[in-house]
């Protein structure tokens, strides 16, 4: 590089460093640059480890490392210190440390280096949990053929197999040769966040051949086969030479579905000739299956010295690259700027680790003799994916529902190097593919809005909201196909030749359009987004999902007339109470008269209460809370009057309270609350039933006689004219339909006439389950059902019902209660009051007439006496 030039990366690094130095206060970087000081490296070879292996590893290491540094370190320098005691405590001046010791000491040394921020490069035994990949480099010495324990251990540590339970099928020979295999599978660690795993181990007798082998495998697999209509989510690990037989038998037992995961290790003797497409040719889409293929070079010669040489070369190469980078940047900036932006110790260690991994990926030979490549199947939605959006519209694979991708590989030095999940569908479901979905216009379940070209531009409704949530939860987009417009020659027009004003209010789901049934049988659609009544599911050429709604039937009649309020003033008391009240008045007046007359002292006798008539008017006036001019002076009389006042208080309070209640809550004539009451209402002469209802089918198998009697007399209607809602308003007809449809009728009439003319029965009967439709061959029925249940638990579906289905409206009980709260007294309420006043005037007139007659009678009698 010329002095006047600067690399773009160096410029960006300079600007970023200057910005950080100005805006963010940082701690001083006290670790020396490679330009001013050599890198410090510690080499620790455990003495006990050398004793166990019977060779002087430290001496070999010293010679190999010095040769590598001398021959390959072109820039910078490295100061190396050697130790033979694994408990040594290194100072923070060291940049990195290379250790050769057993697994336990390796982990102990790693914990110590974290305190002093030293990069650890560990060479250790196999079957050792891998150190954190972003903080250290661990190279287990794996013998050829003994890699299974380390491989499984790495799969758990790196979350390749993040399982909590596993069913393991392993050959007896492999289990004997790898004694630590089971220990690796069940390994758990709090440090590495490895959860414990429940293990079911089945040891395959690999000496069996032919039919005996297949019978034994079938017996073992059948224990984990799903029962009918049962969803089981299990994980299977297969390490066997008989993997093809296991796949074939498991397929016949329906064990390859969206809930199960299969990791199959293909052994070295067959891996080179292995074809995943051939093995899975009979599997249906929806399976989660991955293969680990053995690509170990049988001629590779691995040794500890060779591994030490490769690790040393990778480290020296990394330090040399970083030194070159520092030189290129330092030459273009000032010393102050350099101090602000140069690498910290942790940044250097991270760069060294990445450079070493990149070097080992491309140049490692002996430390990567063992190598396994992992392939996984992409299967979900392959047959229902929209052809316009397919990445490969024409699939030439042996199984068109399977596409195998290479997700990465495993080596002892790097562990798993993966660019994709082992089971991508478990985490990402349909991986954002575009699915074909079938639907029809059927408000309020599916509401489709189309433009002038007939293309669906908006969709809503209960079913469509569920589809949208499924799309979000299962990670797919979708393309809607309307069944009536799928084939032009068979297109169905929903409006041609029809009168919109004669259409029935509401919707039904019992009759599924024939085109929907025909199109869904080809398994080309992920789901038919239509609301369909669940009926005889075992006899249909398709499957129903979990019910998304339950609709009940009811009936609509004329609202009962309100009872006349002309006698409202008598309503608070029963007839018996009124007669009893009259009786106690007639009884109390003579009692008061007698008590007053029997007073022993003449001065205690009240002149105004000396007749029964005057006592009666006194008692009557007290009842009306008017009082009187006279009051008994004797204690006996006062007791009678006092207790009568108590009776009056109770009577008046009770009467007034009940009168308010009767004013507030009107009474109605008896209506039809239950279907079995129809016989008592002779004025209802017409029975109606909507065409195409599940109620018709249900009555054929029910034992309720009132249902059967109704159906015998019912007139099936299919239009608004035949529905004859005016006859219902007149009280001559009753109709049966979904309760929500009847509520919609009541609501529309109320909005138009501002008055409630109809009443719905209190009885709701015949639960009609409504679900969506999936193809009979669909692998995703249980998956869809699981998410529908989740929507129910979260309240989504209930909310969508409230948004799209008609509410009870202003004629229901709650709305009537609101009307009662704001009730104003009108003439209907007060007519009884005026009737009482009229009755009083009439009685007064009659009494006046009687008094005139009596006066004339007395006058004539006196004249006769005078004449005589």
Curated annotation (Swiss-Prot):
Keywords: Behavior, Cell membrane, Glycoprotein, Ion channel, Ion transport, Ligand-gated ion channel, Membrane, Receptor, Sensory transduction, Signal, Transmembrane, Transmembrane helix, Transport. InterPro entries: Insect_Ionotropic_Sensory_Rcpt, Iontro_rcpt_C. One of its GO terms (cellular component) is plasma membrane. SUPFAM superfamilies: Periplasmic binding protein-like II. It is a multi-pass membrane protein. GO terms for molecular function: glutamate receptor activity; ligand-gated monoatomic ion channel activity; transmitter-gated monoatomic ion channel activity involved in regulation of postsynaptic membrane potential. One of its GO terms (biological process) is synaptic transmission, glutamatergic. Residues 1-28 form the signal peptide. Residues 29-565, 664-832 are extracellular. Disruption phenotype: Impaired response to environmental cues such as temperature and humidity. Response of dorsal organ cool cells to changes in temperature is abolished and consequently larvae fail to avoid cool temperatures. Response of sacculus neurons to changes in humidity is abolished and consequently larvae fail to move towards their preferred humidity. Glycans are attached at residues 38, 205, 294, 305, 432, 475, 499, 543, 691. PANTHER family: IONOTROPIC RECEPTOR 20A-RELATED, IONOTROPIC RECEPTOR 60A. This is Ionotropic receptor 93a. It comes from Drosophila melanogaster. The lineage of its organism: Eukaryota, Metazoa, Ecdysozoa, Arthropoda, Hexapoda.
């Amino acid at each position: 590089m010329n002095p006047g030039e600067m690399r773009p990366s160096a410029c960006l690094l300079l600007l970023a460093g200057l910005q950080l130095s100005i805006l963010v206060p940082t701690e001083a970087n006290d670790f020396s640059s490679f330009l001013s000081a050599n890198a410090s490296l510690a080499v620790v070879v455990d003495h006990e480890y050398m004793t166990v292996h019977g060779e002087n590893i430290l001496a070999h290491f010293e010679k190999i490392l010095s040769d590598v540094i001398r021959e390959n370190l072109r820039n910078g320098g490295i100061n190396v210190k050697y130790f033979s005691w694994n408990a040594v405590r290194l100072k923070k001046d060291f940049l990195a440390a290379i250790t050769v010791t057993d697994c336990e000491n390796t982990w102990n040394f790693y914990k110590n280096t974290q305190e002093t921020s030293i990069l650890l490069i560990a060479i250790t035994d196999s079957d050792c949990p891998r150190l954190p990949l972003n903080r250290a480099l661990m190279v287990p010495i794996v013998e050829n053929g003994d890699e299974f324990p380390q491989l499984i251990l790495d799969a758990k540590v790196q979350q390749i197999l993040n399982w909590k339970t596993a069913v393991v099928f392993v050959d007896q020979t492999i289990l004997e040769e790898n004694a630590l295999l089971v220990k690796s599978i069940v390994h758990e660690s709090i440090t590495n966040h490895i959860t414990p795993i429940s293990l079911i181990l089945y040891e395959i007798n690999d000496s069996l051949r032919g039919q005996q082998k297949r019978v034994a495998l079938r017996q073992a697999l059948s224990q984990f086969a799903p029962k009918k209509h049962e969803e089981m989510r299990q994980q299977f690990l297969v390490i066997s030479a008989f993997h093809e037989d296991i796949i074939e038998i498991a397929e016949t037992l329906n064990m390859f579905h969206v809930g199960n995961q299969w990791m199959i290790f293909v052994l070295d003797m067959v891996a080179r000739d292995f074809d995943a497409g051939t093995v899975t040719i009979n599997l249906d889409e929806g399976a989660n299956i991955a293969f680990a293929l053995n690509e170990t070079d049988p001629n590779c010669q691995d040794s500890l010295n060779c591994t030490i040489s490769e690790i040393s070369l990778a480290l020296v190469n990394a330090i040399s690259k970083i030194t070159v980078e520092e030189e290129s940047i330092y030459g273009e900036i000032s010393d102050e700027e350099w101090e602000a932006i140069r690498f910290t110790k942790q940044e250097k260690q991270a760069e060294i680790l990445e450079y070493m991994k990149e070097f080992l990926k491309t140049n490692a030979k002996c430390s990567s003799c063992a190598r396994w490549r992992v392939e996984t199947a992409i299967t979900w939605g392959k047959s229902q994916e929209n052809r316009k959006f397919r990445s490969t519209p024409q699939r030439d694979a042996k199984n068109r529902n399977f596409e195998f991708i290479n997700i990465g590989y495993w080596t002892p030095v790097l562990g798993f190097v993966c660019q994709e999940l082992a089971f991508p569908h478990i985490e990402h479901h349909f991986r954002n593919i575009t699915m074909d979905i079938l639907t029809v216009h059927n408000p309020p379940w599916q509401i489709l809005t189309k433009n002038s070209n007939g293309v669906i531009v908006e969709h809503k409704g209960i079913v469509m909201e569920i589809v949208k949530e499924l799309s979000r939860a299962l990670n797919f987009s979708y393309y809607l196909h309307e069944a009536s417009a799928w084939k032009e020659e068979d297109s169905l027009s929903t409006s041609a030749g029809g009168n919109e004003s004669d259409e029935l209010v509401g919707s039904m789901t019992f009759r599924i359009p024939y085109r929907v049934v025909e199109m869904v049988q080809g398994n080309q659609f992920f789901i038919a987004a239509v609301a369909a009544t669940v009926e005889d599911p075992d006899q249909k050429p398709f499957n129903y999902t979990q019910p998304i709604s339950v609709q009940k039937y009811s009936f609509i009649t004329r609202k009962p007339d309100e009872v006349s309020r002309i006698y409202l003033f008598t309503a608070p008391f029963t007839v018996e109470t009124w007669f009893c009240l009259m009786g106690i008045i007639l009884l109390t007046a003579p009692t008061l008269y007698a008590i007053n007359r029997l007073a022993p002292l003449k001065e205690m006798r009240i002149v105004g209460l000396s007749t029964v008539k005057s006592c009666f008017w006194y008692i009557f006036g007290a009842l009306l809370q008017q009082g009187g001019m006279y009051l008994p002076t004797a204690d006996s009389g006062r007791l009678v009057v006092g207790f009568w006042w108590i009776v009056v208080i109770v009577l008046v309070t009770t009467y007034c309270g009940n009168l308010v209640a009767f004013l507030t809550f009107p009474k109605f004539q008896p209506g039809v609350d239950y279907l079995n009451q129809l016989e008592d209402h002779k004025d209802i002469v017409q029975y109606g039933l909507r065409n195409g209802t599940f109620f018709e089918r249900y009555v054929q198998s029910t034992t309720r006689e009132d249902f059967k009697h109704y159906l015998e007399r019912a007139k099936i209607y299919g239009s608004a004219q035949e529905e004859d809602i005016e006859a219902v308003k007149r009280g001559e007809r009753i109709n049966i339909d979904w309760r929500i449809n009847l509520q919609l009728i009541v609501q529309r009439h109320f909005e138009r006439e501002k008055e409630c003319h109809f009443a719905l029965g209190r009885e709701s009967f015949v639960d009609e389950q409504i679900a969506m439709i999936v193809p009979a061959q669909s692998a995703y029925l249980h998956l869809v059902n699981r998410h529908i249940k989740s929507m129910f638990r979260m309240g989504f579906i209930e909310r969508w019902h409230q948004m799209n289905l008609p509410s009870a409206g202003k004629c229901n009980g709650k709305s009537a209660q609101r009307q009662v709260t704001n009730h104003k007294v009108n003439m209907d309420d007060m007519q009884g009051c005026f009737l009482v006043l009229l009755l009083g005037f009439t009685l007064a007139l009659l009494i006046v007439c009687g008094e005139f007659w009596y006066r004339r009678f007395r006058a004539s009698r006196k004249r006769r006496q005078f004449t005589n």
